[in-house]
């Protein structure tokens, strides 16, 4: 008891909470959560310095909006697709990236795009409420640095455009993500006028 009293007043220290985070039961539960994140969501967590930091990091990682993105097999259509990326905090996450977001001068990144088996999301199902049933503030889960420069044309002129974070590659960047395969028949894009001649657009 004497040693605990010496730490009273230290910012962020709660002897009861800190001790609970270090119990064998808490450690085992954290192990299970990390295994779930890794095996299901492809999230690899950075090593925490203390049991308390580990608990808080896992809670923050779990308690966020969820998107389930339906992907179709890659048929050579232009655009991006599903990737596992490294985050600034040392963790990994599933993200939908456009091809212009990928560094084509990096052999590994270029090969990853070329060998991608699936294509951008066709359907997205979202969970917008937390475990208490309260709505998430979605603005807290936007990556403001996810903008990119794209090539556009206007009245016959080639332009460079700085695009703000898109719906699924920036605005949902800090959501938890699941990728599922959906039938190719659900994907009927119109990227050029000739796409309207496809059978899916003839009815």
Q: Where are each of the predicted segments found?
A:
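OB-fold and OB-like single-stranded nucleic-acid-recognition modules
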Residues: 1-18, 23-203
């Amino acid at each position: 008891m004497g040693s605990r009293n010496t730490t009273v007043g230290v910012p962020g220290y709660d002897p009861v909470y800190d001790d609970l985070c270090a119990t064998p039961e808490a450690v085992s539960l954290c192990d299970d959560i990390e295994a779930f994140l890794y095996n299901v969501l492809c999230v690899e967590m950075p090593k925490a310095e203390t049991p308390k930091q580990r608990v808080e990091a896992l809670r923050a990682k779990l308690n966020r909006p969820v998107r389930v993105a339906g992907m179709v097999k890659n048929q050579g259509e232009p655009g991006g697709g599903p990737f596992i990326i490294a985050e600034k905090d040392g963790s990994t996450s599933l993200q939908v990236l456009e091809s212009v977001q990928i560094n084509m001068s990096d052999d590994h990144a270029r090969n990853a795009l070329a060998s991608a088996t699936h294509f951008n999301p066709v359907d997205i199902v979202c969970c917008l409420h937390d475990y208490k049933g309260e709505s998430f503030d979605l603005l807290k889960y936007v990556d403001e640095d996810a903008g990119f420069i794209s090539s556009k044309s206007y009245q016959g002129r080639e332009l460079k455009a700085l695009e703000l974070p898109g719906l699924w590659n920036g605005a949902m960047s800090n959501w938890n993500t699941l990728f599922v395969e959906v039938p190719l028949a659900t994907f009927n894009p119109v990227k050029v006028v000739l796409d309207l001649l496809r059978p899916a657009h003839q009815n």
